[in-house]
Amino acid sequence: GHTADSVSLVLDDAVLTGDTILGAGSTVLDGKDGDLGDYLASLDRLQQLGEGRVALPGHGPDQPDTAVLARAYRAHREQRLDQVRAALDVLGPDATPMKVVRHVYADVDKTLWPAARMSVKAQLTYLRG
């Protein structure tokens, strides 16, 4: 999901989440080969592991519960998808990723817009099928 070669490894009481779930913040979907459908499916699989496994991310601090965090990451992605859908209602169905970023991320530091653009590109690909 995050990238085409992104994996998580399940251990007895922990999950090495790589970049699928980070220790802080949210994962950027790579604009070249990241796939939102695959990413959401990965989050669903991590939720299905059940609560109680520590998340050991590729970046940032360990997190106490992989399933709880996967659920929160999925909710965040669904919220962003709703925001992108709303932006397309205003901007039109053919809006470019950058136009959507300007609309959805207007309150976010502009230095983060390139990363946001990559995620929006993946979201638009997902929504446009």
Where are these regions (language model features)?
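Metallo-beta-lactamase
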Residues: 3-81
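C-terminal regulatory/interaction regions
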Residues: 86-129
